[in-house]
Curated annotation (Swiss-Prot):
GO terms for cellular component: plasma membrane. The gene is malG. CDD domains: TM_PBP2 (cd06261). One of its GO terms (biological process) is maltodextrin transmembrane transport. This is Maltose/maltodextrin transport system permease protein MalG. It comes from Klebsiella aerogenes.
Length: 296
């Protein structure tokens, strides 16, 4: 005999689905609008969601090709968007790898070792991480200006300097990985030690392979944060050819000439690396997010 759902339950189900559809539409509308702007003729921010005439001129300029107009005019690419995109991927990738390496080793020390001041250090790291990076811009500029005199590859207007600055924000990741490490039974490392493994071997061959989900989460979050960051990169990078895409895209929004179409095409390009990284790591993402809670 078939089960008949009461009307109240059907109403709740309908309301839930309706709210979810509205939520998804609210998320998708800005993305679709940006794509629509990149496909319109001219550099206009307003217009219909579906362009009357699809034009690829903004995409051609973003990809480094010149555009020839009907009257014979040729518009060269105004900015090296693909170079900016490569700079973003390089900086974000190296930063994410470095943050994962530093955070993992620090978290292992806090989770497995005993030393004086451990609790104070943990709390201090978390407190300092709560202050926005904008408050430290003047100090960062002075620091990298002086540092560049001795180590030019990490000075001003270098990607090394930007990466070095980004890698300072590891406190939250250390807490997250530490919480994950504490969920792993220490007897596994003790068994490895009985078999003759050193602490480093137990960490590298036992703990790290079991922690891949949370490391994937930290990598993704670090990659996204680095590839979308603007204040620090715009402070340290001065040469147009060294810009990351997030910084370079601001060149399209000159007060005398807002190039909204070109800006939209570059914005869509900037989302491609994040999407690719997310898709490659999604198999570990859910497990890592649910298992990375910090224990009390």
């Amino acid at each position: 005999m078939a089960m008949v759902q009461p009307k109240s339950q059907k109403l709740r189900l309908f309301t839930t689905h309706l709210l979810l559809l509205i939520f998804i539409a609210a998320i998708m509308f800005p993305l679709l609008m940006v794509i629509a702007i990149s496909l319109r003729e001219g550099n206009f921010a307003t217009g219909s969601l579906i362009p009357d005439t699809i034009s690829w001129e903004h995409w051609r300029l973003a990809l480094g090709f010149s555009v020839e107009h009907a009257d014979g005019r040729v518009t060269p690419p105004p900015f090296p968007v693909l170079l900016w995109l490569w700079n973003s991927i390089k900086v974000a990738g190296i930063t994410a790898i470095g943050i994962v390496a530093l955070s993992t080793t620090c978290a292992y020390a806090f989770a497995r070792m005993r030393f004086p001041g451990k609790a104070t250090l943990l709390k201090g790291m978390l407190i300092f991480q709560m202050f926005p990076a904008v408050l430290s811009l003047v100090a960062l500029y002075a620091l990298f200006d002086r540092l560049g005199q001795y180590l030019p590859f990490v000075g001003l207007n270098t990607h090394g300097g930007v990466i070095f600055a980004y890698m300072g924000g590891i406190a939250l990741h250390v807490w997250t990985i530490k919480g994950y490490f504490e969920t792993i039974d220490g007897s596994l490392e003790e068994a490895a030690a009985l078999d003759g493994a050193t602490p480093w071997q137990a960490f590298r061959l036992v703990l790290v392979p079991l922690s891949v989900p949370i490391l994937a989460v930290v990598f993704i979050l670090s990659f996204i944060a680095a590839i979308t960051e603007v204040p620090v990169a715009s402070l340290l990078l001065r040469d147009v050819n060294s810009y990351t895409l997030a910084v370079g895209m601001q060149q399209y929004l000159n007060p005398q000439n807002y190039l909204w179409g070109d800006f939209a095409a570059a914005a869509v390009l900037s989302a491609i690396p994040i999407t690719v990284v997310f898709l490659l790591a999604q198999r570990w993402l859910v497990n890592g997010l649910t298992a990375g809670g910090v224990k009390g």
